[in-house]
């Protein structure tokens, strides 16, 4: 395992590959039981442990919900030979962090297995790990969609709201975000804290206002690549997952 360092060559940034600056990089891969393929380039997030250290001092009893895009440890490293590092400049996706320095967004996916494992060490037990699409379906989003269809909104307004709500559960869009719920110091008493079929049909669905991006009018494309070019906050969803252990993201090269 090597680490990628960044230095200057004249007026240009350049990368230098050398020995890891800390044993934490190799320790993380060992903890995951992963041997990365030769030539693999990826990220390791060393900020998870200090983050949990801070959170554990704040939350003595309760639930921690993490919603983000990412993978579990094995597919995170085995299926992404070039890692997950991405940049966004004027809503355009790229992979070169050495241009538009200080102006473009730089992001990487979450490696959820380490989030689960490190969370356990700080007393946070995993309750569930699933896609955002499944999570919202469990909460009853289909009831809201049904209410919108039967509502008295004008057709254009109705379709705009249906478009946005369905997009939250699209498997090739926001529905592929992951939802991890962990708990600490809570006595569940054998009860299911995540009941399904909540009767949201009795509630009025939330609707768009002037602060929302109206995807239908923006001609939201069907492809994930098109979605990424419209997404204004520099995040991109991927894949889906079932209950298991999570992963993280980061800036250290492997």
Question: What is the meaning of each model-derived region?
Answer:
Residues 25-254:
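Long, Lys/Arg- and hydrophobic-enriched amphipathic alpha-helices
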Residues 1-26, 79-88:
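A mobile, often basic/glycine-rich helix-loop segment
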């Amino acid at each position: 395992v090597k680490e990628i360092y960044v230095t200057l060559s004249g007026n240009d940034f350049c990368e230098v590959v050398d020995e890891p600056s800390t044993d934490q990089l190799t320790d993380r891969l060992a903890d995951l039981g992963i041997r990365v393929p030769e030539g693999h380039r990826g990220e390791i997030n060393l900020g998870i442990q200090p983050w949990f250290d801070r959170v554990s001092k704040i939350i003595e009893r309760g639930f921690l919900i993490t919603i983000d895009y990412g993978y579990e440890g094995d597919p995170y490293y085995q299926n992404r030979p070039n890692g997950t590092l991405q940049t966004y400049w004027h809503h355009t996706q790229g992979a070169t962090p050495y241009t538009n320095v200080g102006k473009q967004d730089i992001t990487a996916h979450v490696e959820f297995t380490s989030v689960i494992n490190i969370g356990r060490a700080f007393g946070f037990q995993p309750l569930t790990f699933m896609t955002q699409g499944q999570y919202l379906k469990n909460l009853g989003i289909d009831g809201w969609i049904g209410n919108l269809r039967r509502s008295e909104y004008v057709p254009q307004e109705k379709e705009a709201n249906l478009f946005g709500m369905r997009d939250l559960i699209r498997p090739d869009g926001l529905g592929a975000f992951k939802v991890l719920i962990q708990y600490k110091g809570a006595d569940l008493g054998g009860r299911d804290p995540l009941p399904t079929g909540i009767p949201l049909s009795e509630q009025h669905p939330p609707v768009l206002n002037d602060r929302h991006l109206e995807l239908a009018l923006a001609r939201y494309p069907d492809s994930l690549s098109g979605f990424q070019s419209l997404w204004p906050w520099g995040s991109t969803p991927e894949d889906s997952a079932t209950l298991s252990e999570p992963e993280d993201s980061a800036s250290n090269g492997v």
